[in-house]
Amino acid sequence: MDASAAAINVNAHLTEVGKKRFLGERISQSLKGKDLRALFSRTESKGRNVNKPGVAFSVLTSDFNQSVKESLKYEPALFESPKADPKNVAAIVLGGGAGTRLFPLTSRRAKPAVPIGGCYRLIDVPMSNCINSGIRKIFILTQFNSFSLNRHLARTYNFGDGVNFGDGFVEVFAATQTPGESGKKWFQGTADAVRQFFWAFEDSKSKDVEHIVILSGDHLYRMDYMSFWQKHIDTNADITVSCIPMDDSRASDYGLMKIDHTGRIVHFAEKPKGSDLTAMQVDTTVLGLSDLEAMSNPYIASMGVYVFRTDVLMELLNRKYPSSNDFGSEIIPSAVGESNVQAYLFNDYWEDIGTIKSFFDSNLALTQQPPKFEFYDPKTPFYTSARFLPPTKVDRCKIVDSIVSHGCFLQESSIQHSIVGVRSRLESGVEFQDTMMMGADYYQTESEIASLLAEGKVPVGVGQNTKIKNCIIDKNAKIGKDVVIANTDGVEEADRPNEGFYIRSGITIILKNATIQDGLVI
């Protein structure tokens, strides 16, 4: 059969494809005065259509002769977007500020070093996501209380039995002061932290870095950064912001955006209030949400996760906005009007662990069945420090909807909807309900425990017949026998550091290394 081939001029750009899409391609040509256009094939992903960029398809028109109608010779891939290459991307993990909203958990540690899920730390989330995404060039910027964070990173990701990075690296940069007026200042914000260490990208190890992923160290989620970065490449973006649908109750806590039908961000407002908040409502069906889901989530919120072209980031930080110190409130809103800033939908579990309540709720949510998020996944595991602890020993305990980490000793205890961290010791008669116990950094031998009890002192762990509810117990806490921690008076806020505890949002927090004497009622 004879076949005809048509020369097709391809102009790749974004267009609306259907009501619920903002990523598409248009292919057009002029043949006998007719426009030839092809839409993307669609595949099903989680029950929604997903466009496949980078492939052109031919479409027959009525003014071809019959032989052409029957068969049109074409190349199925007239153009393809470059594929994301992990060797060309580096990640910067922001260690966070003083962590005042997570105080007192951050009184002696940086936010990313806060324990979570029984045996992990918050920094393990972005680090594991990077490893699972193939990113092996990672910079971590720290400033406050960074000792335990640095120790955890060194043990887990750099040396000995930690994760092997091959020709990649993990570099930890602590805030420093240098000669000159500007060098006398500590980090003034997220953008300023990156600005102060931008010289690191001139190093030979970083010379091939074309794109930079900016990550926070206090979020809980599982994400393939390569898919995120591929969207960045496909749309030829200068900056791409990862976003999620957001409801009314929490919208004012985040940066909110409006996007056009191509996915380009046309307006960005950081934590708007009142009428400014209402003005940021959008039809989120454009993200692929159902009408019902869109009604419940009328905002598009930034996750605080960004991809920048390296040259664009350098231009913004050092030349265009040298006095702007924060990405969310200054750099991104300023760049929206002059750069191609794209939105990337992340429609999966994500939580900002920024407050005591969100930290507490996110931890206890891990005990649900099925959980909204879980650390174990055979294809994308989460990594942490190898402790080489023995299995937990359980003696006549009742454990319901809970997580018990390794190396624990539990004797005739009742544990409901709670998390018990590594090396925890619970004596007989202990009752936990809605409680997170972070565990201990060390063991005490039976002889040491007996000696302490003989002297009227309290060993590490929880003593006999103690009842604890709605509580966070920080590491190495010593809680005596017959103690009751329940906040039965419903106190919302209280500071009792001399007594070893705080109350935040109605949640009792037992301090690290604190001692709670026998019989105390909180």
From Swiss-Prot:
It catalyses: alpha-D-glucose 1-phosphate + ATP + H(+) = ADP-alpha-D-glucose + diphosphate. It is found in: Plastid, Chloroplast; Plastid, Amyloplast. The keyword Kinase does not apply. Prominently expressed in the leaves. A lower level expression is seen in the roots. Pathway: Glycan biosynthesis; starch biosynthesis. Its EC number is 2.7.7.27. One of its GO terms (cellular component) is amyloplast. InterPro entries: ADP-Glc_PPase, ADP_Glu_pyroP_CS, NTP_transferase_dom, Nucleotide-diphossugar_trans, Trimer_LpxA-like_sf. This protein plays a role in synthesis of starch. It catalyzes the synthesis of the activated glycosyl donor, ADP-glucose from Glc-1-P and ATP. Heterotetramer. This is Glucose-1-phosphate adenylyltransferase large subunit, chloroplastic/amyloplastic.
